[in-house]
Amino acid sequence: LEVKALGVMQTGALKEGEIAKFGTLVEDRVYAVNHQHFFCARLDMTVDGEKNQVVETESVADPIGETNPYGNAFYTKTTVFKTEQEAQRRHKYETVRTWTIQNPNNKNRMGANPGYRIQPMEVVSPFFQEGSVIHRRAGFLLNHLWVTPYNEKEYFPAGQYPNQNPGPDGLPKWTEQNRNIENEDIVVWYCFGHHHVPRLEDWPMMPAAKLGFMLKPSGFFDTSPCLDLPPAKCDPCCE
């Protein structure tokens, strides 16, 4: 999934001699405002069947010793989320944390569960303060990952009417129930965004900034699905 942010940036006016504390000076006494873009993808997953679960994978450096004499080996540890509150998670650079939606009822040719892994493009954390309006109304941004059991009434991560609702609502409210999400019909909510400190090159019309994520098969296919593609032709493109 790819989203492109572009257009004319929001600007503010400065007094004579005033410093642009919250943005970048792009014209005389005009600054473009620092800001962030956020999106929440609602992924109603059906990986090889209706009953799914989410697994977290983290990489761990093995201490230098008999199994790691050169100090460069690492292994992975996995955790299966059982309830909604266990699945309220954030990215962690130190362990290259990833999440995979799996079907625990099926196996691939190596005996592992087939799945699809969320592969981020840009990881962003919100800069709003606790107690602010956006903190109350858009609390879903506090985590990169949420997982809920399927409910047709739970469609918008901030709730039905965020502009008229003082909050909290949506995902923070729904997940207070702490429902079971292991081997269930689940919905995965993934929050991603773009942190934009404006450049002069973004003015007056900014080029597209790409953001998003990928769903990459992880044990879903028994081998590389590219192996049986027809060979490329060397025909000339024109005559």
Which role does the model predict for each range below?
Residues 2-17, 21-239:
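Extended effector regions of multi-domain proteins
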